[in-house]
Amino acid sequence: IHFTKLVKVRVSLNTPYISFPQRVPKKWKYHWVCKNKDVNPKYPIYVVSKNRGDSRLTIKCLERLNIPYYVVIEPQNYGEYKVVIDKKKILVLPYSNSGDGVGRSRNWVWDHSKSMGFKRHWVMDDNIVDFHRLYGNRKLPIGDGGMFRVCEEFVDRFKKFGITIKSLNR
């Protein structure tokens, strides 16, 4: 504890490493913002998470962009998430520690989305720091939910899309 106070770095049991001096996050001069009136996605966004209540990378990003979402967790993680996330945004799976991986959770999300009357939905991992768009030969972070809305409107033009994947580049 004394060491972490000395170097001014928060360390938890899940911290794989620390950097000293701390890295300064890149400050972007520009953001890509959608020009449409309604920039929020029309389909629900689900973030499937397990044991990452301390980091919540994707959730922090979506909240910064004012994009509505649901976080899908197992019952044993509820206490960890309820103190930092609005309870209306938390969906608790009906099972815990199934050992089946994320596939069973994604199937549950699919059923939940269909029961709410949606024909599509977004499913994201819980380790996404930011979303970017390549525009004018420059990589720009997005400033609102317009990117999701544009993708939805593109996919909705076609009838035979079963699954659509937005690429993840790190």
Model-derived features with residue positions:
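Conserved catalytic core of nucleotide-sugar-dependent glycosyltransferases
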Residues: 131-170
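Conserved alpha-helical elements of sugar-nucleotide-dependent glycosyltransferases
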Residues: 54-57, 105, 150
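Short, solvent-exposed loop/turn segments at secondary-structure junctions
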Residues: 52, 127-129, 170
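Short, hydrophobic beta-strand segments that form beta-sheet elements in well-ordered domains
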Residues: 45-49, 68-75, 164-167
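Active-site-proximal specificity loops/subdomain of glycosyltransferases
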Residues: 73-124, 129-146
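Conserved acidic residues
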Residues: 43, 119, 162-164
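N-proximal low-complexity "stem/linker" segments adjacent to membrane-targeting elements
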Residues: 1-64
